[in-house]
């Protein structure tokens, strides 16, 4: 057992050693490739920044610098150092002089203001002391105006007839009438007393035998009792397919996508914008120190360096493009005043004349022409109240006396009016006088027959009637048997039988419509960076001290300026 364990351990150790031997060269090659990529990226970055700085300096030289500040008066007394960086600016001018545009012409006059408030009333005028005679007019007559009488109205309708006069004198008596005819016969008298009953008849012969009768059907019988429970029903047929179900709920969010593939190698970036003043500093002397620095921080800073270089490249490309667009449209400012001592003292050989004499970090703004006339102004404020009016003059004008018009006493002659309406009916006249006595009446007609007389007395009772004949004997009847009655009403329903077996399950219904799509999954992990672009061409060599900081004395001049 121990030999087996030792053998297995030895084999595993040998496999591990072989794996390490194969892995170390691969790791070494990977580290070298990463190192080469970093060096290539730094080299490309350095070449691009050198090229951008050179182009920026060329553009800066073509632009006329702004007015130079006051020269230090002690420069002509004390000797300057040879390496004075006189070609560099003594201050940082990060913004050129802004153009001053003349104001546009004044706008048209505004709308007239609101009228001022009325002035205070003037002082009270002098009282008028002149007197006038009282004016009296004739009183107006209150009498009624007398007009002529109008025409009479039309005659009214005839009045109602008067009451009837009193009865006249009675006429002479007429002749006697003829005697009346005989009256109708009287009603018959009441029936007499009934006669005595007759003797009993002889018994009749025996009747014939009767036939067997058939009675009428009897009445329906009472409902019978409830029957026993029926047998269990047969199994039901399979049910029909169900209706399609409603749409299912939205699915859950999808799983995060896989990591994206590596991007295509980026194109070489364009030249970047110039940095701020003193942004470009000299590199340390010797390439060994830089190589040692990159080699020592390679495992830790490789990803950060590549990300920073990529972001910087994109930003510099965009900024440089915008600066070029602005630089083309810029009008250069006024050239600064020439130093009068340049012709007296010999200039240093290393003057850095190729560099600008100032740091112009912003393009010169264009000179603006006078703007168009402004819009009409706002309506003016309401005017101040006017001054009180002058004192009123006394009214010395005279007026003609007031005369009243004469009042006419004549009758107002009105035109004749239309005829009046018909008058009401007159009152009933008085009763007329008594009439004359009437003439004697004619002989009267015969009278009608008299009413029937009263019924006579009851008659004598009649004689007893004769005995009747004996009747025929009836036949003996047989006992009849009626027909069976109608069937009785159906009995109450028996108890329900046991439930039948369940039918076969119906087929599944159509599947419901697909639910809404789930939310998009989380974005996949970012793909690895693409291969670096091809290195750009070598840039132009920079001027001397192009990447050096301003000398310390620049701060003094900056404070004085």
UniProtKB/Swiss-Prot annotation:
| Cytoplasm keyword on record | no
| Residues making up the signal peptide according to the UniProt record | 1-30
**Comp. bias intervals (Low complexity):** 164-209, 219-265, 422-467, 486-532
A single GO cellular-component term from the record reads: collagen trimer
Residue span, Collagen-like domain: 485-543
- A Pfam short name: Col_cuticle_N
* Pro residues bias: start-end ranges: 100-112, 367-379
Note down the stretches annotated as region Triple-helical region: 102-127, 153-276, 413-544
List the InterPro entries: Col_cuticle_N
What keywords appear on the UniProt entry?
A: Collagen, Cuticle, Disulfide bond, Repeat, Signal
Show the GO MF annotations: structural constituent of cuticle
Under Gene3D superfamilies, the record lists: 6-Phosphogluconate Dehydrogenase, domain 3 (1.20.5.320)
From the UniProt entry, list the residue stretches annotated as the region Disordered. 100-134, 148-271, 367-398, 422-540
Q: Where are the transmembrane segments?
A: none
**Quaternary data:** Collagen polypeptide chains are complexed within the cuticle by disulfide bonds and other types of covalent cross-links.
Q: What does this protein do?
A: Nematode cuticles are composed largely of collagen-like proteins. The cuticle functions both as an exoskeleton and as a barrier to protect the worm from its environment.
Q: Which family does it belong to?
A: Belongs to the cuticular collagen family.
- Name it: Putative cuticle collagen 145
Q: Which organism is it from?
A: Caenorhabditis briggsae
């Amino acid at each position: 057992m121990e030999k087996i364990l030792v053998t297995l351990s030895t084999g595993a150790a040998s496999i591990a050693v072989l794996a390490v031997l194969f892995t170390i060269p691969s790791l070494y090659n990977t580290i070298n490739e990463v190192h080469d990529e970093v060096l290539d990226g730094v080299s490309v970055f350095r070449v691009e920044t050198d090229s951008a700085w050179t182009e920026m300096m060329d553009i800066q030289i073509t632009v006329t610098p702004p007015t130079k500040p006051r020269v230090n008066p002690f420069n002509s007394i004390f000797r300057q150092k040879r390496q004075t960086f006189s070609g560099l600016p003594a201050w940082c001018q990060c913004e050129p002089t802004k153009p001053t545009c003349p104001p546009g012409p004044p706008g048209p006059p505004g709308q007239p203001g609101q009228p001022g408030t009325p002035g205070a009333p003037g002082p009270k005028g002098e009282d008028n002391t002149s007197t006038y005679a009282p004016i009296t007019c004739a009183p107006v007559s209150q009498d009624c105006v007398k007009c002529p009488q109008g025409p009479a109205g039309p005659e009214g309708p005839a009045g109602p007839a008067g009451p009837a006069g009193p009865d006249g004198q009675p006429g002479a008596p007429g002749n006697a009438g003829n005697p009346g005819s005989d009256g109708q016969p009287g009603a018959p008298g009441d029936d007499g007393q009934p006669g005595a009953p007759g003797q009993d008849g002889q018994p009749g012969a025996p009747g014939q035998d009767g036939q067997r009768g058939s009675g009428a059907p009897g009445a329906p019988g009472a409902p019978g009792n409830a029957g026993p429970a029926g047998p269990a029903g047969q199994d039901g047929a399979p049910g029909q397919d169900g209706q399609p179900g409603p749409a299912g709920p939205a699915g859950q969010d999808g799983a995060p996508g896989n990591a994206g593939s590596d991007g295509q190698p980026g194109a070489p970036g364009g030249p970047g914008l110039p940095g701020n003043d003193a942004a470009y500093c000299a590199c340390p002397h010797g390439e060994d120190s830089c190589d040692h620095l990159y080699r020592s921080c390679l495992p830790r800073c490789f990803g950060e360096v590549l990300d920073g270089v990529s972001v910087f490249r994109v930003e510099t490309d965009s900024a440089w493009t915008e600066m070029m667009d602005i630089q083309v449209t810029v009008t250069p400012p006024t050239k600064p005043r020439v130093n009068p001592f340049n012709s007296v003292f010999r200039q240093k050989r290393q003057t850095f004349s190729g560099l600008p004499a100032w740091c112009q970090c912003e393009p010169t703004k264009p000179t603006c022409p006078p703007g168009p006339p402004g819009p009409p102004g706002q309506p003016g404020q309401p005017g101040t109240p006017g001054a009180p009016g002058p004192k009123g003059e006394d009214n010395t004008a005279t007026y003609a006396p007031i005369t009243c018009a004469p009042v006419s006493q004549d009758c107002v002659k009105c035109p004749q009016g239309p005829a009046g309406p018909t008058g009401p009916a007159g009152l009933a006249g008085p009763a007329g006088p008594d009439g004359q006595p009437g003439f004697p009446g004619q002989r009267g007609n015969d009278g009608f027959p008299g009413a029937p007389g009263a019924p006579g007395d009851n008659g004598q009772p009649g004689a007893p009637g004769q005995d009747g004949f004996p009747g025929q004997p009836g036949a003996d009847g047989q006992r009849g048997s009626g027909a069976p009655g109608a069937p009785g009403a159906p009995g109450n329903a028996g108890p329900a039988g046991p439930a039948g077996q369940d039918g076969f399950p119906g087929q599944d219904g159509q599947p419901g419509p697909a639910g809404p799509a789930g939310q998009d999954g989380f974005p996949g992990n970012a793909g690895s960076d693409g291969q670096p672009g091809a290195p750009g061409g070598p840039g132009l060599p920079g001027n001397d001290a192009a990447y050096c900081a301003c000398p310390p004395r620049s701060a003094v001049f900056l404070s004085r300026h």
